[in-house]
Amino acid sequence: MSDAPRGEDAVLVAVQAALAGRPGVLTGARALSHFGEHSAGWVALAAAGALAQPAKRRSWLAVGAGAFLAHAAAVVIKRVVRRERPSHPDIAVNVGTPSRLSFPSAHATSTTAAAVLLAQTTGVPAPALLVPPMALSRLVLGVHYPTDVVTGVVVGALVGKAVGKAAGRISNSVGAEGDR
């Protein structure tokens, strides 16, 4: 008989018990996982935005760059911290992962950076719409502890803000042509 889950393991077991059995939850969480893998979905969305809205090309490219840089930052932090993914027997792992390292969640990091930059580009409150589902998906799938996800959101927000400021400075230095 296994030990009862405690701390963050208990939180994951509770989240999975409450949500994983609901229709569409695991399918949606897996879809988000595949979309966010290596920030590829955000980079593709940014490329499509740059093609569809040439007047906002630089802003859209900043979305892709920010998502990718946030992912890269998360990978570097993972390699330094080396925290293993959840492994308690009561936690169901519902998707494959590219590594055993969990801190921080690169999905939460790149999604938050992309959302911050999408909000600047589109005016839509993207962080409120995009970050919670991706963050929760990492718990439902059993591949991250809550602190992995929260830290990913914080790192992503910092990267998104920094890239947004840098992109603004670049656009301002280009002159009156704005985003072209």
Swiss-Prot record:
Where's it found, cell-wise? Cell membrane
List the effects observed when the gene is inactivated. Answer: Non-essential, can be deleted, but cells laking this gene show a reduced growth rate. Deformation and bulge on the side of mutant cells are observed. The cytoplasm is detached from the cell wall and possesses a discrepancy density compared to wild-type cells. The content of D-arabinofuran residues (Araf) is reduced significantly.
Listed under catalytic activity are: trans,octa-cis-decaprenylphospho-beta-D-ribofuranose 5-phosphate + H2O = trans,octa-cis-decaprenylphospho-beta-D-ribofuranose + phosphate
Cross-referenced Pfam families: PAP2
- Listed pathway(s): Cell wall biogenesis; cell wall polysaccharide biosynthesis
Q: GO terms for biological process?
A: capsule polysaccharide biosynthetic process; cell wall organization
Task: Name any GO cellular component annotation.
Answer: membrane
Give the protein family: Belongs to the PA-phosphatase related phosphoesterase family.
Q: What does this protein do?
A: Phosphatase involved in the biosynthesis of decaprenylphosphoryl arabinose (DPA), which serves as the arabinose donor for the biosynthesis of arabinogalactan, the major mycobacterial cell wall polysaccharide. Catalyzes the dephosphorylation of decaprenylphosphoryl-5-phosphoribose (DPPR) to decaprenyl-phosphoribose (DPR).
Protein name per Swiss-Prot or TrEMBL:
Decaprenylphosphoryl-5-phosphoribose phosphatase
Q: What is the lineage of its organism?
A: Bacteria, Bacillati, Actinomycetota, Actinomycetes, Mycobacteriales
